[in-house]
Structures are given as structure tokens and as C-alpha cells.
């Protein structure tokens, strides 16, 4: 009961902190927001490597087929948080911003032989930014026009999944999730001349819908100590609702008179969408001491319809359009080294991790490709308890992320991730003689 209460408390904290934004990036003003990494504490040390990974004492929710490998006597509970420092650079100007976030809370256990179950809560997207641009109109009256951009929100995911091993070496799995959340984005055009009307554009959406993820893993024995795992994943793309709305408010600060126009959409409710996603990964395992893997992920954003504003500043025509995004390609290479998981030496029991990845730009900004993403991470899995009924791991990793485009803002982010995995023996039967 005490463990269930701890997990419930962690979920409550997660729900409360998900109301806050996990990003400061101005790029979160596009699409559904900044896409969350969604990986656990141990994945992050390998820069999110996951599709071919399975472990008896870790929750790998990025491939639900991995749940079938969960130990039969334990309940696994994993929570994580992160802190980040981001440097923004554009046109010779620099700015730093800090952020901290409660990232996820997930759990898993063995339900039946070769059948594992997992559930948890984690972010899907984040929206959080606030910046402004001022321009001198050179109209002879020293009038300055200021555009202020701000946004908050994000979409969150709660899921329940299962992984089953029907044949030796072959596992299949599925996560059924529920997406909820939304965003509020505002663009304010104001002027130093108090007689000029200010113009406010407000974009809102409220999402409530399902999400489906499928996974498969097949492990082939290469020798007594070596094995190779192939992992596949698929996420269903579909409409998720949201009823995105654009409102335009024109207001005179002197008179206080305001005119509000809601978006015209021919009487039909607009629908946000998520893309079909595909992934393939390989993991080579040498005697559980050295693991090396590679993942490739494709998200078909180019086929997703998204609402866009058309017309002049005084109109509010908001309609669905295709080709707003590019397909998103991501390739990740990672490794984990553990000299001796059962060794008496503390240093040998530590898991040493590293990973790098490249992500192609999927955003289109003014008909130009958005930023490319390069990232690298290092991490450690540190055993902090090693009793018979408790084998917990502290997962710590540092990650550098570079978002760069020749035309737009460059972001350099250093992120510190901390995850704590509790691995408790719940289902063992004690025999007294």
C-alpha cells in the first residue's frame, strides 16, 4: 500500500506540474508545440535510444513490446525531472533562459508469464515562450510598433500498455493512451501612439482524444554471450480534435472600444492532427556488459493538415492546409556499458551511457525549413540500493541540444536529467520452515 501511495503522490505532482511549460523555445509557437522526447531516465543517457532495448528492471515505454521482459517478482516505478539552461542567439544578440520540469511518472509489472503491463503519464508537446520585437516606423512622429509573441500550454499523455512474448525471442506490445491539453498563443501589435488601435490575435485549442502505439521486438542469439534485437514501432496518425480557434481583437486604448472577430471556417469545426510514425532499431548485446544500438524514426508531418490564418490583419479566416510541415527524420546512436551488474565493486555496477542524434527540420517558417537538431548525451545508472527486495537505480544524464538554421534563432541547450527507478520485490512468496 505504501508503494501505491508513493506512485499516486508522484502522479499528483506530475498532473500539477504539467500545467507549467517545459520549454522557453520560440519554436514552440508552431504546430502543436515543441515535441517532447518522451524517453525515460535510462534512455536519456543514450540520447533516447529505445526501439531495440529491453531490460528486466527498466520501463521502456517507447517500445511496448519490451514489457514482456519485466521481471516476474518486481514492481518497477520510475519518475524523472529535468532542468535546462538555453542560450538564444540571433543577429549578434544573445539571451539566456532557465527552466525546470517534472518530466514523467511510469510503472510496470509482470501480470502473467511472458506478459508485462505498464502505465504512466508524460508530456507529448510543450508550449512556452514570450518575446517582443520593436520597429521604428519613421513616420515623423517617432512612432514605435511593437509585436509581442507569447504562448503557454502543451499536450499531455496518460497510457496503459502491455507486452507479450508468444514465441521465444519474439515480443509484441501496445500502448493505448489518452491525450489532453491545449494551448493559448497570442500576438499583440501595439504602438507608442496612443491613438492608434492595437491588434491582438489569439490562437487557442483544447485537445481530448486517444493515442495508439504498437511495438515489436525480435531477439536472435548470435552466440552464447551475444545477441541482436530488432525493434519496430508504429504510432497511429489521426485527427485529435481541439477545435482550434482564432480570435482577432482591435482595441483603441483611448476610447476603450474593442471589436472582436472570431475565425470563419464555413461552419465546420477544425481538427488538429498527429502524424503516422514509424521506427526501426537494432540493439547488439554482449553478455549484458556492452550494448550498442541505433534507431531510425520517421514522423509523416508532411501529410498532416493544420489550421493556418489567411487574409489581412483585419480578417479572421482560419482554415486547414496541407504541406505546412516537412516529414521529421531522426537517427540515434547510443551505447550502455556495465562492467559487472552483479559485481561487489560499486564502480563496476554503474551503467555508463552515451548517445548522439540528428533530427531533420519538420517545421516550415515563412516557406523556409526550420532548424535542424543535433544532440549528444552522457549518463550514468547508479545503484543506490541493493537489498534483496529493493534494487533501485539513480539515472543521471547531461544532454546538449543545438537547434540551428541560417535564417532563424539558434538555440543551444544544456539539460540535466534525473530519474529514479524503484525496483521492489512485491510478488515473492516467503516460506517459513
Walk through the language-model features, giving the residues of each.
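Sec-dependent signal peptide recognition
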Residues: 2-10
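N-terminal signal peptide c-region/cleavage motif recognized by signal peptidases
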Residues: 14-16
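Active-site-proximal flexible loops/turns
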Residues: 9, 70, 127
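N-terminal, post-signal peptide beta-strand-biased segments of exported outer-membrane/organellar beta-barrel
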Residues: 18-122
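Outer-membrane beta-barrel porins/channels
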Residues: 20-38, 43-44, 114-433
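Residue-level detector of alpha-helical transmembrane segments in integral membrane proteins
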Residues: 9, 57, 268-269
